[in-house]
A protein has these predicted regions:
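N-terminal secretory targeting modules
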Residues: 1-217, 223-230, 249-254, 387, ...
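Alpha-helical scaffolding within the catalytic cores
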Residues: 195-204, 238-244, 268-283, 305-314, ...
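Structural recognition of the beta-strand scaffold that forms the well-ordered cores
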Residues: 214-218, 223, 257-262, 288-293, ...
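Extracellular serine-dependent O-acyl
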Residues: 78, 99-101, 120-127, 323-328, ...
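Oxyanion-hole/transition-state-stabilizing segment in secreted/luminal serine hydrolases
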Residues: 216, 224, 228, 268-305
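Solvent-exposed loop/turn segments at secondary-structure junctions
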Residues: 221-224, 263-268, 295-301, 322, ...
Length: 565
């Protein structure tokens, strides 16, 4: 191959801001059969940039808060994608920058797309060739659409700046030495409390004997596997499960079942409601070990820890006495809710692992893994971060195996540390309501096809959460849902949405307004639990749900209820 006789001088590179740097992406099928990797940027964009380069001036970053500032600052977008497998490097992935609109958040924004080769070649998208207009508000998301023949890739995405703007060059991170003493010391710091390991040792001994063992995980998006690529093979849950199998079985874990029940953006308030369905399948599955991870999801928990402790006690009360491990993840800003949740673990002397205690001290000095390496975005760990989280749990497994067998089990009947109002909560939905309640559903006979989907267990494809729901039928203006039952507390689980088709609903308990549920407050499609009744004694109550005045034609989806009878 011969080159040009007179090659042009290289074009001088403009200063650039990195949005993604050598980040793993993967094409996971959605419920429509498309393979897409989505990175949401609303409320995260500036922190994500700071996570890659903390020295960028705040005045420059503020220009990226809205699209008018973006067009002023940014000259072009550069996207380079490299397939992980050589045979996939002839493929193309379609990149999309989705702008959220001012009027219709998801429907009116501009979408900037480019077809990118998977051979590492950088594709440039000039801003002056984009159709960005006054209706565009913010950068909402980056999407990567995969062809069938390409499953995993690595992407670098950056904004090249217009003349007159400059930002610092970033330094390349050194590789992570997973075999170093410093790495081992970091992992050892994660063991917040070995605790009473009687139940955990019993599960380990069962596994060693070749008996059937179930290792289950319940939590938020990190447990679901967010940031892990591919999600079903690189999540901390799967990696630590594999670590359990490799250490305590001689058949590669053939006798150990993996249950993964992480749901993005949801707290323990929802976890306690869905535990029976998502983890135990209403008693058909009996977990021997349950890892609970809500330390970065419970900020919005209206019970401030009562739901979390209720979930712990609910799990512990099972006839087969499962071991419970409390797992505390951390955000890029070094925050979690350990200070609230650790007292629950201390109350029952539970094994506890703190990823925060492991990684945060070394971010500043004696660094083993940088923030840029550990985090996929401001909330979720990367593949490296998931590996660290898994190694923290595996270290606990090993320490428990080496420890003496305690004579006594933990006492889960003792006075709660925070509260346990919901420890006997059960799920009530369209599939089982006749066991508990009398319900009339005028106008709520529909089925919502756009509910939250999550990847469960060993699957790399999503399946619906709360599929047995009640959805308001379109064009019905007098919809009324009425439920009568005997209970002492009720948690309403409804669907949040970003669609303007959805409207507020008024929720009455015994003819008193308990709350007005607004599905647009959080602005995205997920499950939202809200307490509408919490009393000490069980008695008959009637729940009525109607659309808020002025919004009778809009949609609303009741996903289910958590009730204590």
């Amino acid at each position: 191959m011969r080159g040009p006789k007179a090659p042009k001088d290289p074009t001088k590179k403009r200063p650039s801001i990195y949005l993604m740097l050598d980040k793993n992406i993967a094409g996971i099928p959605d419920n429509y059969g498309n393979c897409r990797d989505t990175n949401f940027m609303e409320g995260r964009l500036l922190q994500q940039i700071k996570g890659i380069c903390d020295e960028i001036d705040d005045d420059i970053l503020k220009l990226l808060e809205h699209m008018d500032g973006f067009t002023k600052l940014v000259h072009s977008i550069g996207v380079s994608i490299t397939a992980q497998k050589d045979e996939e490097k002839d493929s193309f992935i379609t990149f999309t920058m989705q702008c959220y609109g001012k009027a219709d958040k998801y429907g009116s924004g501009t979408q900037v797309t480019a077809k990118c080769p998977c051979n590492g070649e950088e594709v440039m998208i000039p801003v002056d060739e984009m159709n960005i207009n006054e209706n565009d508000d913010i950068i909402g998301a980056f999407h990567f659409d995969f062809p069938e023949n390409c499953q995993g890739a690595c992407v670098t995405l950056r904004f090249y700046l217009n003349d007159g703007y400059s930002v610092p060059e970033i330094e390349v991170d050194p590789p992570i030495d997973y075999e170093s003493n410093a790495y081992d010391e970091m992992i050892e710091r994660s063991l917040l409390n070995l605790g009473n390991v009687k139940r955990l040792k019993k599960a380990i001994e069962k596994a060693k004997r070749g008996e059937k063992v179930v290792v289950a995980y319940i939590g938020g998006s990190i447990t679901q596997g967010a940031g892990a690529k591919p999600i079903h093979e690189m999540s901390y849950a799967y990696l630590s499960y594999r670590g359990f199998c490799e250490r305590f079985t001689d058949n590669d874990g053939a006798n150990v079942t993996f249950v993964k029940a992480g749901v993005g953006g949801t707290p323990s308030e929802l976890g306690m409601v869905r535990y029976d369905k998502d983890v135990t399948n209403f008693g058909e599955i009996k977990p021997d070990v349950v890892i609970v991870e809500f330390a970065v999801n419970d900020e919005g928990d209206e019970t401030e820890g009562v739901s979390y402790e209720s979930l712990v006690r609910k799990i512990a009360k099972a006839d087969n006495e499962p071991a419970i491990i409390l797992n505390f993840a951390v955000f890029m800003n070094e925050w979690n809710l350990e200070s609230r949740l650790v007292p629950v673990g201390e109350n029952y002397n539970l094994p506890m692992v703190s990823v925060k205690q492991a990684v945060v001290p070394q971010f500043g000095k004696n660094t083993v893994i940088t923030k840029r390496q550990f985090f996929y975005d401001i909330f979720h760990p990367s593949n490296d971060g998931h590996r660290v989280m898994a190694d923290c749990l595996i270290h606990l497994f090993e320490e428990a195996d080496a420890a003496e067998m305690p004579e006594e089990d933990s006492d889960f009947t003792r006075q709660p540390a925070i509260g346990a109002d919901f420890e006997d909560v059960v799920l009530l939905d369209r599939a089982n309501f006749e066991e508990f309640a009398t319900i009339s559903t005028r106008g709520f006979e529909g089925s919502d096809k756009e509910i939250q989907y999550v990847e469960r267990d060993l699957n790399n494809f999503p399946s619906p959460e709360f599929e047995n729901h009640w959805a308001k039928t379109e064009n019905v203006t007098d919809a009324e849902f009425v439920m009568t039952l005997t209970c002492k507390n009720i948690v309403l689980v409804s669907k949040d949405s970003g669609s303007p088709q959805f409207g507020k609903a008024d929720v009455y308990v015994d003819d008193k307004l308990a709350l007005t549920a607004d599905p647009l407050v959080n602005g995205w499609n997920h499950c939202n639990p809200q307490i509408i009744l919490n009393e000490r004694e069980s008695k008959e109550h009637t729940v009525k749900i109607v659309m808020h005045p002025g919004e009778e034609e809009k949609l609303f989806t009741i996903l289910g209820f958590g009730v204590t009878l």
